């Protein structure tokens, strides 16, 4: 879920608000639906995964049983290529390496800037500055860095309850 915190910032939504949770829910549902539809398309080309059984896969009480009716219909008709589709992996280093340091994981960044220490192959360490992507973009666009807008919040500035509410908003997807 790399970048959710920064995406909400760039949409002008404060992370710990009902509006941000609604947008995160919308994003999560979209990602889920597109992942399942892509797997159906792959099943059309290559067949369903070997142990696929539509009745068991779509039976009540499991994740796939909560999919929209039109997606379940496509799965029943064509099968699904991937037995597992969605997971949220740890994304701290991944966001730095591949996402230009967009907020890592589901939460907003823990800091707008920090120093990262990297061990080199020769055993020495190199320190370098890291800036959050949304913060850096705001600065580049001429934003007032002395007074960030209220939707710029770090993970440390929001309550544990707000973290929990965001997880609850996206967990069904």
Q: For each predicted feature, which ranges?
A:
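Catalytic alpha/beta core of large soluble enzyme barrels
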Residues: 61-62, 74-81, 86-173
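Internal maturation/activation junctions in enzymes
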Residues: 13-91
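Conserved active-site and cofactor/substrate-binding residues in soluble primary-metabolism enzymes
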Residues: 2-3, 22, 26, 30-34, ...
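Short, electropositive, low-hydrophobicity segments enriched in small/polar residues
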Residues: 7-9, 16, 96, 127
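Glycine- and acidic
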Residues: 9, 13-25, 119, 147-154
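Core structural elements
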Residues: 1-12, 172-173
